[in-house]
Amino acid sequence: HRPDGKLLEDTVRPLQEEGVLLMADCMTIEDIRHAYELGFDLVSTTLSHNKPAIETSLNEGPDLPLLRQAVEEFPDLPIICEGHVHTPQDARAALDAGAWAVVVGTAITHPTSVTSWFKAALDE
């Protein structure tokens, strides 16, 4: 259920009837499957790094395993890689894994984070 008490389906349907393009921010392959079943126009891996640590060993970089699985399962659905894209190499890896597009956020909008990444790498 949504904060307004509606099912996602009940929110999505009227928007689709009006021709609105819909993107689903997803955490898991199950989320992507559900978005596909509901007819979302595209999905992103934005929330994949929000999984509990026990479910993922991802610490850095985009969730390429989820991206690859989604691209394989849904070859006609645009999959956007979003989240933890810190370097041009991360973006290239996402495109090579089949991403339809890549979103670079914090790496270009938050200098404090970028500085901490460099410091951590140099302290190793």
Each PLM stretch: what is its role?
Residues 1-15, 29-34, 51-71, 88-92, ...:
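Active-site-adjacent beta->alpha loops and helix N-cap segments on the catalytic face
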Residues 14-24, 73-82:
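Short beta-strand/loop segments at the ligand-binding rim of alpha/beta enzyme cores
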Residues 17-18, 38, 73-74, 97, ...:
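Alpha-helix C-cap/termination motif
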Residues 19-21, 57, 105:
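Flexible, glycine/proline-enriched loop segments at strand-loop-helix junctions
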Residues 28-39, 81, 85-104:
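Catalytic cores of alpha/beta
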Residues 41-48:
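Non-cysteine beta-strand/loop elements that form the S-adenosyl-L-methionine
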Residues 124:
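Charged C-terminal helix
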